[in-house]
């Protein structure tokens, strides 16, 4: 008696082929994902400086330096206001290590004993609240450190000039207002002087009339 096993295997193979066959039907996804615009907050700023580095902050309680992360430090200038801020993010997690404005009066100095590092004080906002921090940053080369320090100092000085110009404009405005007020006061004084003789003439005429009346009464 012939075995029917091969025929059975053939039928199973055909069934598997039919199950795997592409019918061409389109299957709609269960969840539709929409594109989300990702913003970094740097869209309205131009990068003045962009360097690889490692940043530290001084822990006052522990009296020691603590690493904030390694990544790229940027000096970003706002396209409208002209203000410059320092921003650094960790290279892998993109967590913010530092985020503060460079304002007039700020200074940066070389770390003693290490020409590749420098430090400065700043009012930082990287943790979501303003804090006075002492930062130290280390670069791969002395040249990069010098470039950073020179640019930092240049920006701080330019902010000082801008501040003085603003104060100068405000002072000029006050002087101009003062001059206008003085002119108005002078005009009022002249008007008062012009009115004064007329008033005196009226009083003189009045006195003459009274004297004439007295003379007539006595006669």
From Swiss-Prot:
The keyword Chaperone does not apply. Its main location: nucleus. Residues 26-161 form the RanBD1 domain. It comes from the Eukaryota. GO terms for cellular component: cytosol; nuclear pore; plastid. SUPFAM superfamilies: PH domain-like. InterPro entries: PH-like_dom_sf, Ran_bind_dom, RanBP1-like, RanBP1_RanBD. The keyword Methyltransferase does not apply. Gene3D superfamilies: Pleckstrin-homology domain (PH domain)/Phosphotyrosine-binding domain (PTB). This is Ran-binding protein 1 homolog c. It comes from Arabidopsis thaliana (Mouse-ear cress). The lineage of its organism: Eukaryota, Viridiplantae, Streptophyta, Embryophyta, Tracheophyta. The gene is RANBP1C.
């Amino acid at each position: 008696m012939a075995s029917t096993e091969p025929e059975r295997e053939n039928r199973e193979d055909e069934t598997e082929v039919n199950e795997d066959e592409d019918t061409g039907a389109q299957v709609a996804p269960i969840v539709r994902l929409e594109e989300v615009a990702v913003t970094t907050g740097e869209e309205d700023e131009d990068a003045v400086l962009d360097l690889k580095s490692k940043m530290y902050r001084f822990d006052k309680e522990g009296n020691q330096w603590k690493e904030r992360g390694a990544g790229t430090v940027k000096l970003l200038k706002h396209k409208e206001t002209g203000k410059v801020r320092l921003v650094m993010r960790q290279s892998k997690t993109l967590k913010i290590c530092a985020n503060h404005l460079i304002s007039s009066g700020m200074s940066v100095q070389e770390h003693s004993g290490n020409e590749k590092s420098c430090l400065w004080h700043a009012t930082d906002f990287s943790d979501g609240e303003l804090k006075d921090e002492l930062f130290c940053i280390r670069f791969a080369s002395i040249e990069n450190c010098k470039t950073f320090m020179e640019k930092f100092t240049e920006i701080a000085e330019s902010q000082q000039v801008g501040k003085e110009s603003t104060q100068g404009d405000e002072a000029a405005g006050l002087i101009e207002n003062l001059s206008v007020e003085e002119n108005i006061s002078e005009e009022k004084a002249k008007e008062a002087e012009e009115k004064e003789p007329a008033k005196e003439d009226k009083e003189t005429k009045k006195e003459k009339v009274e004297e004439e009346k007295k003379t007539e009464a006595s006669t």
